[in-house]
Amino acid sequence: MPSRRRTLLKVIILGDSGVGKTSLMNQYVNKKFSNQYKATIGADFLTKEVQFEDRLFTLQIWDTAGQERFQSLGVAFYRGADCCVLVYDVNSVKSFDNLNNWREEFLIQANPSDPENFPFVVIGNKIDIDGGNSRVVSEKKARAWCAAKGNIPYFETSAKEGINVEEAFQTIAKDALKSGEEEELYLPDTIDVGNSSQPRSTGCEC
């Protein structure tokens, strides 16, 4: 059977626990939203096949736990990322204030070759809560923060209502492509999982 070659782009979603990282990922990939909150343990990822400018590529979206005790997992998961998405809850000042910590954490752990130009995207989520009346972080304040960090693209979303989720991820995909650190993924029509129990090196010298 013939095989296909695709470009693999790795995207990392970071932010405090409970800001809606998993919901954003599920809304984009599966067009689904669940009101039942379940904290991500460690990290999880979903993939979506996307076509852009006559190119077929696979977007691999990593959803990492927001709890500090899991930040030590960062090196393995952050390395090789093509774009980093910083998410906060517009109804939580703390989650917004922590964006800088998450950005710095990523740059330290991922150690990109060109940190000044590495693509970030910021998402202010949960704009649907209480009809927007409970928000405590203004769009103006968020955009000012993004401008100060090198004009980071900014989106306000509702994972629950699907507002601006598609638009945000379109920009994420485009920025990931521009990063230039693309990996070619060889995808055969059948996948041999017979040796899946054998450990694989992450390249980390521990």
Curated annotation (Swiss-Prot):
- Indicate whether Repeat appears among the record's keywords: no
InterPro entries in the record: P-loop_NTPase (IPR027417), Small_GTP-bd (IPR005225), Small_GTPase (IPR001806)
Binding-site list for GTP: 15-22, 63-67, 125-128
Look up keyword Translocase and say if it applies: no
**Biological process GO annotation list?**
protein transport
Q: Where is the lipid attached (S-geranylgeranyl cysteine)?
A: 204, 206
What keywords would UniProt list here? Cell membrane, GTP-binding, Lipoprotein, Membrane, Methylation, Nucleotide-binding, Prenylation, Protein transport, Transport
Q: What does this protein do?
A: Protein transport. Probably involved in vesicular traffic.
The entry sums up its family as follows: Belongs to the small GTPase superfamily. Rab family.
Name of this chain's protein:
Ras-related protein Rab7
